[in-house]
Amino acid sequence: MLHSPVFPAFGHHLAQHPAMPLAMELPRTPKASFNIDSILSRTDRPASKLSMEMPSWQPPSPPSMPYRYSYGMMPYPPVWLIKPTVGYPNMAQQQPMRMPRGECLCPDPTCKERVLPFSHCPNGAMNPLSWRTGPCKMKRIRTVFTPEQLEKLEKEFLKQQYMVGTERVDLASTLNLTETQVKVWFQNRRIKWRKQSLEQKKAKLSQFGVIPADSSDHTDDSRETEEDEDDLDVEL
């Protein structure tokens, strides 16, 4: 028996408890077997318990799509050219094309009337975008002048058939009109004056029994003069 000079009772304590382990052992749980028979015969499956507590994630269902369209082939949302029919979301009803005043998107190089509102184009009823491929038909605007305005314009036309620059601006301001309205009035008045002059000339020649010459030259000259004018399709 061992005796410690420092702790005399230590040897006596060991003598009374010779089989006492130095460290306490914890109870061990039996190891689970992972062979096929043990897995199939198990009744307490923790996976099922976990699935009850935490349901598996499911992807959200795709949004409802109109009939006749598959996912990834959805049409573009309707713009102001197409208006869906009430009660039939899959049916489209064409609406007339309306452009802001002062704009014409006609790509035809011969179409110079770009200051008037867009009315419609040929074959526009078949395709809402067919106006991009053909010359557009411009909507005429009729400007109504008062008798005082017409009288003043006629007086100025007798003085000079062409009015440009500050004179036209001052006249438009005096008559409470726009410069474009005054410009178009003088343009149409010149065309009317040329036609009247040609008719008067033919009438005088017919009185003397003279057959008037072919007016093709005069027509060509008049056409060239009209082409030199600004092509503003506005009636007075």
UniProtKB/Swiss-Prot annotation:
PROSITE patterns: HOMEOBOX_1, HOMEOBOX_2. Residues 223-236 have a biased composition (Acidic residues). Keywords: Developmental protein, DNA-binding, Homeobox, Nucleus, Repressor, Transcription, Transcription regulation. It is found in: Nucleus. Induction: By activin, derriere, fgf2/bFGF and wnt8. Repressed by bmp4/dvr-4. This is Homeobox protein notochord. The keyword Cell membrane does not apply. Gene3D superfamilies: Homeodomain-like (1.10.10.60). The lineage of its organism: Eukaryota, Metazoa, Chordata, Craniata, Vertebrata. GO terms for biological process: central nervous system development; negative regulation of DNA-templated transcription; neuron differentiation; notochord formation; regulation of transcription by RNA polymerase II. GO terms for cellular component: nucleus. Expressed throughout the embryo during pre-gastrula stages. Localized to the dorsal lip of the blastopore (Spemann organizer) during early gastrulation, after which expression continues in tissues derived from the organizer. Expressed in the notochord during mid-gastrulation. During neurulation, expressed in the notochord, archenteron roof and the prospective floor plate. Also expressed in the region that will become the epiphysis, the pineal body precursor. Residues 138-197 bind DNA. Transcriptional repressor. Plays a fundamental role in notochord formation, acting within the mesodermal region. InterPro entries: EMX-VAX-Noto_Homeobox_TFs, HD, HD_metazoa, Homeobox_CS, Homeodomain-like_sf, HTH_motif. Residues 209-236 are annotated as: Disordered. GO terms for molecular function: DNA-binding transcription factor activity, RNA polymerase II-specific; RNA polymerase II cis-regulatory region sequence-specific DNA binding. It comes from Xenopus laevis. It comes from the Eukaryota.
